[in-house]
């Protein structure tokens, strides 16, 4: 019987593959003042979103599941990610941002990333 270590890819190979995907997407995606880049970072427990103006190198608005409101929220990680999408949409609208370029940072458009994106669209962001 083969051990799980020989069946699974090593974590470093997965990390390298994700870094390649991220670099491939990042060289095509660039945020401007009119259409800043909305980058989603995902960890095993949390989701972080920043709306970035790449010309000036400034973060315009941000939200994450680390905020007090969402830490106390009950539910699964996908529901919390959807709430983060709603919050980032509201904060972006308050800052005068309606259009963004979506950067999933090498992650698959599935699960928490998709839930966040759909909630941000419903909150009024166009991407």
Swiss-Prot record:
It comes from the Bacteria. The keyword Zinc-finger does not apply. GO terms for molecular function: 5S rRNA binding; structural constituent of ribosome. Residues 1-26 are annotated as: Disordered. Keywords: Ribonucleoprotein, Ribosomal protein, RNA-binding, rRNA-binding. One of its GO terms (biological process) is translation. Residues 17-26 have a biased composition (Basic residues). GO terms for cellular component: cytosolic large ribosomal subunit. The keyword Nuclease does not apply. Part of the 50S ribosomal subunit; part of the 5S rRNA/L5/L18/L25 subcomplex. Contacts the 5S and 23S rRNAs. This is one of the proteins that bind and probably mediate the attachment of the 5S RNA into the large ribosomal subunit, where it forms part of the central protuberance. Belongs to the universal ribosomal protein uL18 family. HAMAP family: Ribosomal_uL18_B. This is Large ribosomal subunit protein uL18. It comes from Cutibacterium acnes (strain DSM 16379 / KPA171202) (Propionibacterium acnes).
